[in-house]
Amino acid sequence: MAVNVKSSTRDIKELNPLVQVMLNTALAKIKKNKISPLVVETYRPKERQYYLYGQGRSVATCVGAGMPKSYAQKYARGGNKVTWTLNSIHIQRCAVDLIPQRNGKAIWNSNDKDTKKIIEIMESVGFEAGANWSSSPDSPHFQVKGISVKGKCFTKKNNNKFVTKVIQKKLKKAGFYGDYTVDGCWGKATDNAIKKWKKSLGWRVNAKIGTTALKKLLSY
């Protein structure tokens, strides 16, 4: 099926299952704060990424960056650049672009109070906020880097520091992380805390955080 490179996908169900849980939890909190969120883009096909990267770049530049020549010839053109990478986390189904809207109007202002609140809430559930990047900040962009496209569990081998910090904070709040430091490093202490927490709930004891466990943790 042909890809409509000029159209963005907004369907949350196109995201990794773990990312879906995180986003849905965040959206509920955002709405609770009387903010109307607008999902701008979720999953992005690779060809659409080629199309976006081609904006403001020459064929030679695109090919030099790693774009197949056929796509570079098709999508390279003048104008303003709209993205800085060929390997967006959107392609991996682990990123979302999200902004507030008021009176039916999208707010593309990184200094807007509702934008700042959205960033705060998205970070509270484990997203990395593009707004905080020192190079080429991207305030609508939120991602979960370092996990596999089809990964169904956060584990010692499938996580990142943003997610791990949230898991540690929630385990500490639930009384299972003791005096350990919330450092974003998934080690033996995090494994043991997850196992003790799961045992207290009568669940199968392991050190994995799947969608059900993640949803439960984020409710604390």
Task: Please give the residue ranges for each predicted region.
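Soluble non-cytosolic domains of exported or imported proteins
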Residues: 9, 13-21, 43-46, 109-116, ...
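Extended, low-complexity, intrinsically disordered C-terminal regulatory tails
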Residues: 27-78
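Catalytic cores and adjacent binding grooves of peptidoglycan-active enzymes
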Residues: 66, 73-154, 159, 166-169, ...
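Short aromatic/hydrophobic-glycine micro-motifs
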Residues: 35, 57, 126-130, 176, ...
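Short low-complexity, flexible loop/linker segments enriched in glycine and/or proline
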Residues: 52-56, 143-149, 196
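Active-site acidic/histidine clusters and adjacent loop/turn architecture
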Residues: 2-41
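Short acidic, glycine/serine/threonine-rich helix-capping segments at coil-helix boundaries
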Residues: 132-136, 156-220
